[in-house]
Regions:
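An amphipathic alpha-helix adjacent to DNA-recognition modules
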Residues: 3-6, 10-14, 18, 23-27, ...
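The alpha-helix within a helix-turn-helix
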Residues: 31
């Protein structure tokens, strides 16, 4: 798995977060938008909240 894929997940998540609330974003939407498999998402993150934690920690 590449850093590019992980960054694509983060970028897609941030784009979605700008348009709707966190509780309305699903893993399925993220992977469909990225064009990746759900297993790829779960390789990097346990769930949406794990992704959010990664985004917040890298922003600081």
């Amino acid at each position: 798995m590449s850093k590019f894929t992980q960054q694509a997940i983060i970028d897609t998540f941030l784009k979605m977060l700008a348009c709707k609330s966190l509780d309305k974003i699903t893993v399925k939407e993220i992977v469909n938008e990225c064009g990746i498999n759900r297993n790829t998402f779960y390789y990097y993150y346990k769930d949406i909240y794990d992704l959010l934690e990664d985004v917040v920690s890298t922003e600081n």
